[in-house]
């Protein structure tokens, strides 16, 4: 039958409600809408239903039947409807009250296990809509003499195919809306560039539906080939069908009486709700409310809320500032809007200052946790396990003798410990460090810088394994040294100490070489935070790495160092001086001590014979006063210092000189870094 494009055929409300297509109803409702299915459990909140009309309507009228604030119900029927005036979709539910179900779960404290199963089955499964497109109207789409521009792919998917062999391909389309009303449009393919347009009949549809720019129109082609048409408004209009049960005192009395009758007689009562708006907050899935009751909230707890829309999901966060009932006299024990909140984005006026527990999601505990962003650099660093970060311990007291790679933690750059470390030695900032005792009854005393030295015990025993450094490629036992970090100051290992040292080939050498236990497979003691010992250089010339500056001072003090390992394989050092027994010399700024105190309280002393000179060993003798600074194998400071250094003899000098000793890359000690200071003033670190 022919249809006048300027008129539409009206049908009765009952017929329109019966003719609502489920696919079209869900398409108009939107993707974020869940409809309870038949047989599912939900909780009806009469207090929220009465307040849906606004204006403090949650107060029950005089003479109303007494009903609890939470009514557990079973869904026995679902009817899809649409408002004839606004095309807003809503549902009419048939419910049967089952109050004992909720009370039983409250007493038992259960329902948590079944909540996960009910979550997936309570919502009605949405039908698949493969042939559908939705477009937001523009100003040209809603103009009086304009048409509706359809994307090409959407037109080819939803509309019947056009005959492109003709000069001006066109056809007539008939679409049915939610109320069963048929609308006729002329579909044409024209323009430059060519496009699909709906021309005749479109203006009548826009005027009749009162569409404006920003509203959305959707077309859907079902499995039967029928073309359907729906509207989704940007701003929802008031649906009188939803507020009819609560817009007067008489209607409120009727709805409360029907709920009370259902609680007593298991009768059916009906309610209407809009799944797209907040008016449906008086219908809560049973599992959601029970889950919120099993997880109580507290003041100061942080939360977040996710709002689902057609375009995107919005998230908001806030803080619970109080817990109180809205109306404890008329609705005692009600959990509806019982949480007073303070939003993070307080400038947004759309947020309410009260929310329900089932509307929010908890985030952490009552104290807000600030998450730090990791550094952008993916270079990892190693640090020692948590514990005493300032004071190293021997023989398993904090740090084991042999530490594998599984005991190290990886940490991103910028997340290192704040403690001061230099080549594996941990420096303490605490002035008072107590004495410690190892499992083998050996006492250790710590000075103000946190270094541990043996106080008493059996003499140290040298192992058979002797390490001779042969170049930069050797990495056994050495900590990683980056370019620009080759030089560092050596802090005093004890108070009132004097050192003895001798030079060999312009190098300050120790008496013994570094010993390493053959049974120990871990790192050296220096990498575990224990005192650094001196290494013995071989008579052959040690090659300097190409990217590392090596400084040699012939005017350095003469030291004599005895190195060894304890019974656990831990490396320790014993320093001796040629004049230790005759005079006492202190470090600057420290307290003087007698040699006896040093011997009894700090460590055991040992004297060793002086190493042979260069002439005795058969090696060529170089100028003693010459300083060498090499870069890529070439000397840079050959003439920086005077050549008259032959008057220097080997002997004991005081460790408390004006300039502190300098620790070279492989542990050699120098006390006169004049050439180093002159060179560093001209060139920055990291060259």
Swiss-Prot record:
Superkingdom of origin: Eukaryota
Subcellular location per the Swiss-Prot or TrEMBL entry: Nucleus
UniProt entry keywords in alphabetical sequence: Auxin signaling pathway, DNA-binding, Nucleus, Transcription, Transcription regulation
GO molecular function: DNA binding
InterPro entries noted in UniProt: ARF_dom (IPR010525), ARF_plant (IPR044835), B3_DNA-bd (IPR003340), DNA-bd_pseudobarrel_sf (IPR015300)
Pfam families, alphabetized: ARF_AD (PF06507), B3 (PF02362)
One GO term (biological process): auxin-activated signaling pathway
Binding region for DNA: 133-235
UniProt main location, coarse: nucleus
GO cellular component, one term: nucleus
PANTHER family in the cross-refs: AUXIN RESPONSE FACTOR 14, AUXIN RESPONSE FACTOR 4-RELATED
Role played: Auxin response factors (ARFs) are transcriptional factors that bind specifically to the DNA sequence 5'-TGTCTC-3' found in the auxin-responsive promoter elements (AuxREs).
Family (UniProt): Belongs to the ARF family.
UniProt protein name: Auxin response factor 14
Organism: Oryza sativa subsp. japonica (Rice)
Gene coding for it: ARF14
